[in-house]
């Protein structure tokens, strides 16, 4: 009996594997639970937990847990928003440099605010924020636009239609504007962390070019409000 040709052999192999289901990029079966890295969740007593939370804690005793991602930690300095900003600032895969710039930026903000704190009179010190993480989050919130513009084609003509932005899109635009402003409009002798720390402090006080860019986008959306009915496509 002659040996089967290549195509016939492949057909027989595929016919014998029809009962198998291909699972791509899957390390864990559905019975594995997601890991919980927040220490405060485990420190709460059972009396304060709801019925659902108590059931979930009992399930974690008997069911296997997935391994935590390498970028997730239970450290008090872990911040998902800052990690996202660090990844967006990264160029060429050099995350160590991006992380170093972010740490230097937070340190520079801390030094600037402490200097301002000690120079201020005693009655004004309570109003000066010295936590760089609080300043970063508030500055990012001040840079987030509420409404954006979407290009809609109607009758062969393109219209810029104002549309509300989702939370992820707002955060992305704020981060992108901050990074672009610090890269494109800084002096060649000014370091990246110096420019970024100053941009964050300006945005914290509702000042700076990034906040102006947000207001300009809102003005353009207000000018194109006549095309808002095109949003229901």
From Swiss-Prot:
Protein family according to the UniProt entry: Belongs to the universal ribosomal protein uS7 family.
Subunit structure: Component of the mitochondrial ribosome small subunit (28S) which comprises a 12S rRNA and about 30 distinct proteins.
Localization annotation: Mitochondrion
Primary localization class, coarse: mitochondrion
GO molecular function (one): rRNA binding
Species for this entry: Xenopus laevis
Record bears the keyword Ribonucleoprotein: yes
Organelle transit peptide: 1-28
Source taxon at top rank: Eukaryota
Record key words, sorted: Mitochondrion, Ribonucleoprotein, Ribosomal protein, Transit peptide
Protein name: Small ribosomal subunit protein uS7m
UniProt-listed GO biological process terms: mitochondrial translation; ribosomal small subunit assembly; translation
GO CC annotations, alphabetized: mitochondrial small ribosomal subunit; ribosome
One Pfam family matching this protein: Ribosomal_S7
